[in-house]
Amino acid sequence: MAFSGHHARKRFGQHWLKDESVLQRIVAAAALQPDDHVLEVGPGRGALTAQLLASPAASVQAVELDRDLVAGLQQRFAAEPRFQLQSGDVLALPQLGDGERRPTKVVANIPYNITGPLLERLVGRLDRPVEPPYQRLVLLVQQEVARRISARAGQSSFSALSVRMQLLAHCRSVCPVPPRCFQPPPKVQSEVISLDPLPADQRPPQAVAKQVEHLLRLAFSARRKMVRNTLASAAPAVGLEVWLADAGLTPQQRPQEIAAQQWVALAAALQPAL
């Protein structure tokens, strides 16, 4: 057997998805076409890999950190010419996937302890988006993170991450995934999300994007305080209320009450003073 005697390792955050219906929903959400090259992060024992290879996708390019799993994956898919495997840390590799056939989509059950850095690697930041963007990312993440990504202004889970991701991609929930669908089961609820990165002409201009990042760091460092206080250092106090009004905001609003596009308007209004 390819993976005989291998058990999930806590230090790698390994929780292998075993539910066939969830695996199928993940692949269906990716809407794979014959010209798609798929990047899979953390294939584990290959349950999702097998479903991806059963799709029309042109290739599946997987990245696995656990060297003990690499040999098993190579053995399991030895007869599949569309399968390629990189051994290494997805956060450290200089290039993801085949250099000649850049992945067009990402499908992955990612280790929850690297969700933030991995999202930055795959989608980018407002001031440094990944170029060219992937067409779609279908990711299995901790439900708390999924809710933060899709949260709207005024909701308790709305955060700087919500603003960043909503300005970089169309985000939607695919399905919740309970712990029983994994081996071993995690102690948290999970969710499949789909992200469609926005083209450059639908994202904030680079100069404004940098200002949005700056304002998010200031405001969400004290998310319960009014922006009149948290943004006081961003511009002269005498002009701050005028700039807030220009962006359609009031000094009494708190960061979690300001929608993603309002942060863009605020950054554009404050830009000359930053």
Swiss-Prot record:
Its main location: cytoplasm. Keywords: Cytoplasm, Methyltransferase, RNA-binding, rRNA processing, S-adenosyl-L-methionine, Transferase. It comes from the Bacteria. One of its GO terms (molecular function) is 16S rRNA (adenine(1518)-N(6)/adenine(1519)-N(6))-dimethyltransferase activity. It catalyses: adenosine(1518)/adenosine(1519) in 16S rRNA + 4 S-adenosyl-L-methionine = N(6)-dimethyladenosine(1518)/N(6)-dimethyladenosine(1519) in 16S rRNA + 4 S-adenosyl-L-homocysteine + 4 H(+). GO terms for cellular component: cytosol. Its EC number is 2.1.1.182. InterPro entries: KsgA/Erm, rRNA_Ade_diMease-like_C, rRNA_Ade_Mease_Trfase_CS, rRNA_Ade_methylase_Trfase_N, rRNA_adenine_dimethylase, SAM-dependent_MTases_sf. The keyword S-adenosyl-L-methionine applies. The keyword Glycosyltransferase does not apply. It is found in: Cytoplasm. SMART domains: rADc. S-adenosyl-L-methionine binds at H15, L17, G42, E64, D89, N109. PANTHER family: DIMETHYLADENOSINE TRANSFERASE, DIMETHYLADENOSINE TRANSFERASE-RELATED. Belongs to the class I-like SAM-binding methyltransferase superfamily. rRNA adenine N(6)-methyltransferase family. RsmA subfamily. Specifically dimethylates two adjacent adenosines (A1518 and A1519) in the loop of a conserved hairpin near the 3'-end of 16S rRNA in the 30S particle. May play a critical role in biogenesis of 30S subunits. This is Ribosomal RNA small subunit methyltransferase A. It comes from Synechococcus sp. (strain RCC307).
